[in-house]
């Protein structure tokens, strides 16, 4: 069964090791007849989560007006979500952390997704 694979690149470097690794993964997924979509976080505007929890009261709709709405749409469509990023100071880089924090708005919709870190 073909899957819809979403690769989210969270490195600030466009052609670093993370991009190379993600590109190799994408090539393998495509060769196995899966549809692949890529999002490069450094090219997106993502506002920090304010922790207001309004998203929990209105069906996962965040009040921030930025590129996360596009990312949410792609996450909803995907069967497999790959989070590709380097490790900086023992954790996610800030680009990836900001995006992950904002997925609080859609956490109930992500339970059945298959994530690869």
What role is predicted for each listed range?
Residues 63-117:
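Helix-loop-strand module that forms the ligand-binding subsite of alpha/beta enzymes
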Residues 15, 56-62, 69:
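Cys/His-rich zinc-coordinating "finger/knuckle" motifs
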Residues 2-34:
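N-terminal beta1-alpha1 ligand-phosphate binding loop
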Residues 32, 58, 77-78:
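Structured helix-beta-strand junction loops
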Residues 20-23, 52-54, 95-100:
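Short, glycine/charged-enriched secondary-structure capping and boundary segments
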């Amino acid at each position: 069964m073909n899957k819809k694979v979403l690769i989210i690149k969270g490195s600030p470097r466009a052609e670093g090791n993370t991009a190379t690794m993600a590109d190799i993964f994408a090539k393998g997924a495509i060769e196995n007849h899966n549809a692949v979509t890529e999002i490069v976080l450094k090219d997106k505007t993502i506002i920090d989560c304010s922790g207001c929890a309004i998203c929990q009261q209105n069906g996962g709709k965040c009040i921030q007006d930025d590129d996360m709405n596009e990312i949410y749409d792609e996450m909803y469509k995907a069967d497999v979500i790959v989070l590709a990023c380097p490790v900086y100071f023992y954790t996610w880089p800030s680009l990836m952390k900001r995006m992950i924090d904002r997925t609080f708005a859609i956490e109930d919709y992500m339970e059945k997704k298959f994530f690869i870190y």
